[in-house]
Amino acid sequence: MPTLSETTCVLPYHAPVPLTSLPLVFHRDHLFPYTSYGDTLGTPVSREFRLLVLENDAVKVTVCPDLGGRVMSYIDKTTAKELLFSNPVVKPVRILPVWAFISGGIEFNFPIAHSPTSIDTVGSSTGKAATPDGEYAYIRVGEREARSGMEWVVELGLLENSPVLVQRTALRNDTARAHPWMMWTNCAVPSTPETEFIYPAGPALRHDRAVGDITWPCDGSDWEKNITQMTGFFWKPGSGHTFGIWHHDTGGGLLHLADPAQVPGKKLWTYGFGADRSWALASTDGLAGYSEIQSGPLEDQGQKPLFPAGGELRFEEYWMPAATRGDFARAELPAFHLPGWQAQTPWLGHAHSSWQCGWESFRCGHGPMPSSIVPPGLELEDALRAAGAAESLALWLIARDRAAEALPLVEALASPTAQRLAGLICWKTLDDPARAAAHLRRGPLHDPIAVVELDQVLSVLQLTDERRSLLESAPPHGCVIERRAHLYLTEDRPAGTLRLLRDTVWPLEHQRYVRGTLWHKASLALGLDPAIPACLGEDALATFGEYWSD
C-alpha cells in the first residue's frame, strides 16, 4: 500500500539578497511583481523545510512545498539508489527570471522558466483513491501565479508496488486576458564522465555558442565526457516516448516516459566537463555537478505562445528507475487505470501565499491595504481606486499594459518612487526621454537601480557631463560600475572600459550579456582580440529562448 507522511529536514541555506526594494517594471530581465536578487550570502544558516513523503515497497518520493513544490528525492528502494541529483545545500545563483535559481530535484516551471517561486512556498495537498490497479496515493503542488493570475498544479502519485512516479499536470487561465506561457519540468540528475544521455535518434536543435540543427547523437554528445561547454539540446516533435540517463559507472539510470502527442518537449541541459563546470558547482557549494533532463508540452524554450483566456491544458507523464541500459529500448508507456485526470478539480489557488491572501482580503473589503508590492494577477483595480492608492494602482495598471492610464496618477505625486514610475512611463511607453529625465532626476537616486535608469536616459539624450557627475557620486554597485564602463566607451576611452571590467569582481550571471557586450566593443575599438574573458562572470551562450519577461 502506498503511504503518505509529513516531516521536515534541515539544510544549509544561503539566503539571497534582493537587488532593490523598487518595483522592477519595464525591465526585460526582471519579472515584476516578483523580487529580483542581486547576491547570495556566502555563509549559510541552518533552515528547516517542510517535506511531504510518498512511499511504497518499490520507491520513496520526497516533495518540498517550501522550495517551489520540487521533488527533492526519488529513491529506488530495491537498490537504495537516489535517482535524482538531490542537492545537499540550498544556494541560489544568478539565473533568470528572478536571479535566484536553485538546482536539484524535479522543478516545475510555469508560466516561465525557471519558476519565479522556486525558492518560495507553493500550495500543497495529499490524497488517496481506489483504482483497478490498487490504491493510488498522491501529492499535489501548485499555485495561482501572482503576475498573470494563471494557475498550475502538478500531481505526483504512486500505485502500490509500482516504481513508476506518475506526474499529472493541469494548467488554466481563468482570467479575462491571454497571457504568454511555457511549462517545463526540469529534472536534475547526477552527471559524471560515464553518464550517457539516451534520447531519440534524429533531428534536434543544439544551443551552445551558436544555435543550429543537428542529428542526434552528434560528435559523441550523448556522453557527458564528450561535452566541453554548457550546451542545451531540444528534440523535434514526433520523436519517441522515452528519454533519460544511464550511469555506466554506477549501473543505474532514470527513464522519462510520455505520449509525444501530449508532451512533445524534450530537453537536455549540461554544463559539460570543461571550464563551464564551475557554473554547475556554484549552486552546490562545489560539492557536486549535475545535468538536467527536461520535458514539456511545447517543442522548445524559444516558444512562449499566448494561453487563451478561459483555456485549460492537462497532460500526463511518468518517471521510473532503469535497472539496465536495455530498459530504454523496452520501456512502454504505463497503462494505469487512474482516476480520470480531466475530471479532477485539483486547483490550489493562492491560499498558501500570505502575500496574495493579504491583497485578496483587501480586495474583498476584509482587511487593510498591504504594504507589499501589488500582485497584478488579482483583480484589484476597483479596490485600489476606492482606497485612493494612486501609486499602487499605477503599478497595477503598468503590469496590465495600461501605462498611459497610470501616468497622470504618478505625475501628480511628489514622492521619489512615484516620480520614478512617471519617468519610466515617459521613456518606455511614450518614447520621450527628455520628459522622462525630468521625472527620473527626482527619483530615489540613493538606489543603484534608479541611478542606472536615469543614466540610460541621459545616455540617449547625450548628456555626458551629467552622466559623469551622476555615476561618480553613485554607490559602487555592480550595475553602476557597468554604466561607468559604458560611459568610458561613450567618451572614447575604451581602455578605461576594459580596465574597469577587468578589475571588478563579478558574480556568475547566466544569459546576461551586458559586460560581455561592453568588453567586445572596447576590444574592437582598441584592435584587440574581442574574446570574452571568464572573469566577467557571463556565459558565452548564443542568445536563444524566451526566458525574459517581455
What does each model-identified segment do?
Residues 2-14, 52, 66-73, 77, ...:
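A contiguous, surface-exposed recognition patch within enzymatic or periplasmic domains that forms
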Residues 2-25, 31, 49-121, 269-271:
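Acidic-aromatic substrate-binding/catalytic surfaces of carbohydrate-active enzymes
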Residues 19-46, 50-55, 103-164, 193, ...:
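Extended, loop-rich substrate-binding clefts of extracytoplasmic carbohydrate-active enzymes
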Residues 286-293, 305, 315-385, 403:
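Long, contiguous interaction/recruitment modules in multidomain scaffold/adaptor proteins
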Residues 338-349, 353, 375-384, 402-412, ...:
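Alpha-helical repeat scaffolds
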Residues 388, 417, 421, 449-452, ...:
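Start-of-helix register in tetratricopeptide repeats
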Residues 392, 421, 453-456, 483-486, ...:
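"A position-specific structural signal for the A-helix of alpha-solenoid helical repeats
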Residues 397, 426-427, 458, 488:
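Residue at a conserved register position within TPR or TPR-like alpha-solenoid repeats
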